[in-house]
């Protein structure tokens, strides 16, 4: 009997992309750092990545799995009204599929005590909640927060004037998650007064009774000032025993009002309360900022530039990072938008990674970050954290696809890849860490202390393989990725050189990924149409032909490894 479960389903849910793990190529001309170190805690290895965010997440997976403390994302809301740099008028099925693919990688990137924070409106919030339950596990749902993004009523609203967005909070492993608390505010401390000049300082009062009747705690207490007796209200009882209540009255911890005749209440002194408070699920604009505030912040940093319609203010991100991270932790935003997450993380002493594909990566994010690093950005949270500048970031772009088709339709290694990039790409695909040795020419990467990889575009002879095997030694192993090997069969090679594993480029990777697919973005113009069931069945012969169709056979005109010309 099949065990059934509750799940969210949609058209195309079973289809998953075979993502190519691209390498990241730094453009040092766009990387930026401060002219001097401001503090010993300055970070310079932050990353700004230009490219499709699904491919970028996949590119980060090998190096950063289990290392990200907090992911904050503000994906297009699928409302048709998001920022003009995105086209977010997507059907529910496409949107859910795109989000699922990203969330699965995000979960792998999170540390065991890490958390995910997603802003969303009520158009997709409930679908997204169920989707996140499926990806992260319902037990790892922490809370849904309501952030008041607008403070004014929209008078022309058809039904309700929309004033808030949601923030879904998930953790990778609930048992490991520890959330910080907010520091007490002046407004919270201002609630504490000292009307009786108590030498212990300011205090506030709370109920002295509990909402249940316990016989041992039902008795009269007497006001020291007037002698008036007070009983707990019907259906309730005092919170303390008679003996403890006598002590509290003697210690002047029970307040009967200035007249001495008021309902008694328990004093709570300011110096006795925690200097921090837990966050609530209602985040009002006074404490957490609003959209208009975010627009002003963006306009102040980017001259003559359009801004996002629903940007997030720095105060909102600061609150998230206060709760979810500590100084030095790594923060990821794969929908960088105007770069607020990175800017705030930078000012708060967190390390960060941001991903953005739109041109606003150049028009908004880079100029903004440069001003942050130079200390010129004194808006947002800068004054609150005493930001003086410092640190830096490295700018990366996704490498092109490793495999392309040459003019005869044959799959070959992209000629844009030099030897170093090819070695790094194959390390990533094969699960090795790219770490070229300065001592051993054949060590391009490693997966352990004794397992290595060597990448070459040469055709290796049996003599070369023998020399390589001798140098590697019997106590180590080497994966050899080469264009071809001759003078020996694969079976004989395995017997003759047990410390070598031979694979041919590009054959070894052809079935591993979707090569040449550069855009998995949320732009509907670039998405394929969802396959809808046809009203008429497709002819069986057509299906059979399609299923059994073989790839073109290489002919005598087949090009070299890098296409028409060898690199």
Feature map (PLM): residue ranges:
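Glycine-rich adenosyl-nucleotide cofactor-binding module
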Residues: 42-43, 47-55, 59, 292-330
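SAM-dependent methyltransferase catalytic-core segment centered on the flexible catalytic loop
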Residues: 36-39, 54, 59-115, 123, ...
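PRPP-dependent phosphoribosyltransferase catalytic core
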Residues: 353-567
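Active-site-adjacent helix-turn-beta-strand microarchitecture at beta-sheet edges
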Residues: 3, 171-303, 318
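DnaQ-like (DEDDh/DEDDy) 3′-5′ exonuclease domain used for proofreading
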Residues: 1-72, 79-101, 483-485, 508, ...
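Coupling/switch/interface segments within P-loop NTPase motor domains and analogous charged loops
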Residues: 1-14, 252-257, 468-469, 476-484, ...
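Signature of N6-adenine DNA methyltransferases within the class I
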Residues: 112-113, 122-181
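Conserved S-adenosyl-L-methionine
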Residues: 3, 8-20, 92-96, 123-125, ...
């Amino acid at each position: 009997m099949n065990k059934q479960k509750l799940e969210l389903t949609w058209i195309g849910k079973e289809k998953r992309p075979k993502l190519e793990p691209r390498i990241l190529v730094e453009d040092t001309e766009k990387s930026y750092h401060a002219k001097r170190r401001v503090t010993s805690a300055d970070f310079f290895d932050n990353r700004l990545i230009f490219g499709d965010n699904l491919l970028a997440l996949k590119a980060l997976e090998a190096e950063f799995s289990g290392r990200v403390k907090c992911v904050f994302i503000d994906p297009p809301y699928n409302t048709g009204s998001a920022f003009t740099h995105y086209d977010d008028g997507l059907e529910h099925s496409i949107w859910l599929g795109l989000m699922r693919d990203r969330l699965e990688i995000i979960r792998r990137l999170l540390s065991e005590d890490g958390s995910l924070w997603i802003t969303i409106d009520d158009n997709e919030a409930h679908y997204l909640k169920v989707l996140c339950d499926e990806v992260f596990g319902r037990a790892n749902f922490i809370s849904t927060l309501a952030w008041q993004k607008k403070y004014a009523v929209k008078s022309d609203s058809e039904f309700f004037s929309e004033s808030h967005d949601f923030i879904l909070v998930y953790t990778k492993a609930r048992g490991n998650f520890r959330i910080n608390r907010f520091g007490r505010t002046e407004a919270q401390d201002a609630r504490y007064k000292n009307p009786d000049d108590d030498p212990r300082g300011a205090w506030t009062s709370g109920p002295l009774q509990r909402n249940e009747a316990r016989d041992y705690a039902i008795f009269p207490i007497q006001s020291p000032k007037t002698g008036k007796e007070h009983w707990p209200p019907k259906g309730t009882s005092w919170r303390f025993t008679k003996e403890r209540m006598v002590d509290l009255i003697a210690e002047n911890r029970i307040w009967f009002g200035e007249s001495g005749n008021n309902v008694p209440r328990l004093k709570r002194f300011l110096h006795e309360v925690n200097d921090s408070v837990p966050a609530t699920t209602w985040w009002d604009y006074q404490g957490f900022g609003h959209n208009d505030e975010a627009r002003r912040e963006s306009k102040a940093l980017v001259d003559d530039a359009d801004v996002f319609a629903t940007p997030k203010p720095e105060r909102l991100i600061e609150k998230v990072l206060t709760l979810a991270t500590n100084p030095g932790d790594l923060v990821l935003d794969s929908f960088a938008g105007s770069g607020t997450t990175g800017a705030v993380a930078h000012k708060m002493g967190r390390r960060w990674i941001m991903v953005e594909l739109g041109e606003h990566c150049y028009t908004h994010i880079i100029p903004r970050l440069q001003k942050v690093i130079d200390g010129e950005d004194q808006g947002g949270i800068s004054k609150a954290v005493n930001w003086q500048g410092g640190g830096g970031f490295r700018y990366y772009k996704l490498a092109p696809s490793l495999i392309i088709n040459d003019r005869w339709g044959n799959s070959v290694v992209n000629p844009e890849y030099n030897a170093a990039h090819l070695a790094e790409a194959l390390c990533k695909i094969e699960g090795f860490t790219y770490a070229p040795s300065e001592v051993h020419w054949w060590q391009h990467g490693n997966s352990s202390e004794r397992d290595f990889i060597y990448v070459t575009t040469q055709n290796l002879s049996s003599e070369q393989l023998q020399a390589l095997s001798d140098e590697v030694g019997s106590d180590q192993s080497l994966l050899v990725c080469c264009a071809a090997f001759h003078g020996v069969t694969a079976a004989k090679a395995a017997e003759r050189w047990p410390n070598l594993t031979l694979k041919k480029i590009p054959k070894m990777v052809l079935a591993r990924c979707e090569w040449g697919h550069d855009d998995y973005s949320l732009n509907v113009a670039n998405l394929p149409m969802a396959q809808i069931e046809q009203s008429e069945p497709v002819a069986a012969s057509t299906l059979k032909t399609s299923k059994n169709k073989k790839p073109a056979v290489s002919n005598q005109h087949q090009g070299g490894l890098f296409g028409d010309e060898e690199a």
